[in-house]
Amino acid sequence: MFLKSELLECNGSSVTLFQLSALQRIEHLEYLKQLEAVEVGDFQAAITFTVKSGAYLVAMSLWHGHPLKGSQGENAAAEVAKIQDEVMQTWPTELVAEAEYKVKLLSGMIAPVIDEPTSSGEERNEPAEPVTAGKALASELKFAMKLAREFGRPDWRAMLAGMSSTEYGDWKIFYQDNYFHDAQLDAHFSGLLYTISTLFFADPELTPDSFSILSPAPEAIDIDDPDDDTLMAKAAGISGGVRYGPDGSR
C-alpha cells in the first residue's frame, strides 16, 4: 500500500513522516479511549496521557521507515512502543506537536487550514497599538492557564474562544503575519499547553485545585498563593521566554 510521506526538519536534521494506514488510525482511536479511564481531577495523569498520545501517533508514522520495523517479528505494537519511548525521551515537545499535526494532515485526520482571500473592498481591523510577541504570549498564557486550572486536558480552541475580540485580534495578527504559518498554529498551541501543564505538576505544592478560578475551595485560598503574573512569568521561563519573529524583533 502506498503511503504519503513528508520530511520533518529540525536543527539541520530530518526524519520522514508517513501517512497512517487505516488500521493504524483505528489503533490510534483505541489508544485514545484510555483517556476515559483517567480519573476526573487527576490532572497529572491526564496531561501525561496527552503527551504520550502525541508521541504514540508520531511513532506509528515513523515506524514505516524506522530501523526497528520488523525487528520484533509480528509484534509491530512492541516496535511502535519502543519508537514512542525514543520520541518522548529525545524530542522537544514542540517538535512532537508539530510532527503530530503533520501526521494528522497526511492521514486525513484533520483538514488543512485555508486562508480566505480578502476582497479588495474589505477593510482589515488593525490593533490600536503594535502587537508584540510579549503581548501575544501574555494572552496565550492567561487563557491556557485558565483552561489548565479548570480542565485536566486543555483545548486551545476553547482557549481562543475565551479571548476577548481585542485579545484574539492581537494574537491572530502577530502569529499569522509575523511568525507562524497557519499550518503551524495547531502545533504551536499543543506545545504551549504542554508548557502550561508542566507548570502545574513541576511543583508538588502547585495544583489546579489550589488555583481554581471558577470554584476555589475555601481551604485552598491563601494570600500567599502566586497571582497570574507570577504564574505567567514561570510559564514563560519554562517555554524559553518571549518568542521572536523572523526578523529578530520582539
Swiss-Prot record:
Q: Which NCBIfam families match?
A: phage_lam_T, phage_lambda_G
What is the role of the protein in this entry?
A: Promotes tail assembly by creating a scaffold for the tail tube proteins. Tail assembly proteins G and GT probably wrap the linear tape measure protein to create a tail assembly scaffold. This allows the polymerization of the tail tube protein, during which G and GT are released, therefore they are absent in the mature virion. The tail assembly protein GT is produced by a rare -1 ribosomal frameshift. The ratio of translated G/GT is about 20, and this ratio is important for proper tail assembly.
Q: What is this protein called?
A: Tail assembly protein GT
**Gene Ontology biological process:** viral tail assembly; viral translational frameshifting
Domain of life of the organism encoding this protein: Viruses
Taking the first listed entry, what is the main subcellular location of this protein, grouped into a coarse class? host cell
Family indicated by similarity: Belongs to the lambda-like tail assembly protein family.
GO CC: one term? host cell cytoplasm
* Entry keyword annotation includes DNA-binding: no
Q: Does the keyword Nucleus apply?
A: no
Q: Where is the signal peptide?
A: none
> What are the subcellular locations of this protein?
Host cytoplasm
Q: How does it assemble?
A: Interacts (via C-terminus) with tail tube protein. Interacts (via N-terminus) with the tail assembly protein G and the tape measure protein.
Please report a single Pfam family linked to this protein: Phage_tail_T
Q: Which UniProt keywords apply?
A: Host cytoplasm, Late protein, Viral release from host cell, Viral tail assembly
